[in-house]
């Protein structure tokens, strides 16, 4: 960062053109990890520092050539087996995961499959992999996560073809171009969004947008842990402008995953 006292005036960047100096009246940190803010000296927390963890990363992928009719029949036949909370079905295809685990074909610390039909009836999105202990502010950790994420994609895809009706002839169409990061730095701002703000559906006067996503917190108590906390008062909550304004530094704003929020509140607004 290029600083003039407590004001950020630009930065030194490395790009395909080489090392460049870019001056800016205002810089908006959209790095996801709050890289600019952290290097400028703004205080932050990395994940849930009380528990010394971050939410696990994931490697999303998409499959095609699925017989949707057979898959829907499988789900319909087990509709009474779903674990339900607040009217929402959880743990899709967990009966097949249990079968595969018993036969030694499932090594992941997951108990179910996140599977969602795409626009085309035969294309389905899979959100199941879970890579624990990844620090997205560390390049070596990111590399390890990429390798493990793609290994898990291979295992999950093999499982789908072998155990899930309708997926016998499925094809792996694509996977994420990079690791999906749920949590890293939470930059300290003039205001901080809390889980209570979300539950109570608070909309401060300086809200810059409103959200309706409930808190979806992964892996806080181990790789099989999932917490889902819904809004109890109203249908939405606001993100105050103060959450985008970092402490101590002028000329800098935050956007995206890194803005000022507690770890559990970030489980909602990260989406």
Annotate each PLM feature.
Residues 5-10, 14-26, 30-268:
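Flavin (FAD/FMN)-binding glycine-rich loop and adjacent Rossmann-like elements that form
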């Amino acid at each position: 960062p290029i600083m003039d006292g407590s004001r950020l005036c630009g930065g030194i960047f490395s790009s395909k053109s080489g090392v460049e100096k870019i001056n800016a009246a205002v810089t908006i940190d959209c790095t996801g990890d709050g890289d600019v803010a952290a290097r400028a000296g703004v205080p932050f927390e990395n994940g849930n520092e009380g528990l010394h963890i971050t939410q696990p990363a994931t490697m999303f992928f998409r499959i095609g050539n699925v017989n949707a009719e057979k898959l829907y029949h499988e789900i319909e036949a087990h509709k009474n087996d779903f674990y339900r909370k607040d009217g929402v079905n959880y743990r899709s295809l967990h009966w097949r995961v249990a079968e595969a685990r018993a036969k030694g074909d499932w090594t992941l610390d997951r108990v179910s499959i996140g599977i969602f039909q795409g626009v085309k009836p035969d294309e389905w999105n899979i959100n199941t992999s879970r890579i624990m202990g990844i620090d997205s502010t560390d390049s070596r950790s990111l590399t390890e996560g990429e390798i493990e994420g793609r290994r898990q994609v291979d295992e999950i895809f093999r499982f789908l073809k072998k155990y899930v009706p309708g997926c016998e002839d499925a094809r792996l169409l694509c996977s994420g171009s990079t690791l999906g990061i749920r949590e890293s730095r939470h930059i300290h701002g003039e205001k901080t969004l809390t889980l209570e703000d979300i539950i109570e559906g608070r909309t401060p006067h300086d809200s810059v947008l409103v959200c309706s996503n409930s808190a979806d917190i992964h892996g806080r108590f181990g790789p099989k842990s999932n917490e889902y906390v819904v809004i109890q008062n109203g249908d939405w909550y606001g993100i105050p402008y103060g959450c985008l304004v970092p402490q101590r530094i002028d000329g800098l704003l935050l956007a995206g995953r890194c803005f000022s929020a507690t770890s559990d509140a970030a489980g909602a607004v990260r989406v």
